[in-house]
Amino acid sequence: MTGAVTVAVAEIGAFPGRGRAHPRVVEEVSRRIRQREGTPLAGSFVARCGGSVVIVAAHGPSDHPQVRLLLGDALEAGRAVGLNRGLDGCGDRTAASFATIEGTGANTGILVFVTDRAGPGIWTPLLCRLFADPFETPRLADDPVLREGFVFELTGSPTERFQTPGGILSLLAALRDGTGR
């Protein structure tokens, strides 16, 4: 059975100076989400990143409009707690950002990268090093399949496809196993 995962992030009540989401705000959002688990949510996780509240929710593939409303309502409830406490950053509901990933299975691993006050490009150099630099990830040179390298696809770039050098990985493998002394 395939499903979907929706991630929602919103700054709805933080202290001091929007540095950390208030625990009561996070608790209220979490409570509202837990009340609705099972219909239509299969599971969820609520956390904070800096002054923002983050919700990761698993659900059926066709449920995402309904799920977005549910998550928006939970964020609105958290925002109300923030307003009542006079917290910073009680943005409006429309400031929440949502992303839905379709086609996830029961055992699909999900990795969510969240930053506070940084664009999505903040992760690009780190992920590139992780998957392309054999000095960062030695297994790249050890495994014959991984040694072929990776193709990176960057949207919005004039050259959208980049092939990582498989040759350097073969050289390192030869140096490691003693055939290239």
Label each region the model flagged.
Residues 1-181:
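Regulatory and interdomain segments flanking nucleotide-handling catalytic cores
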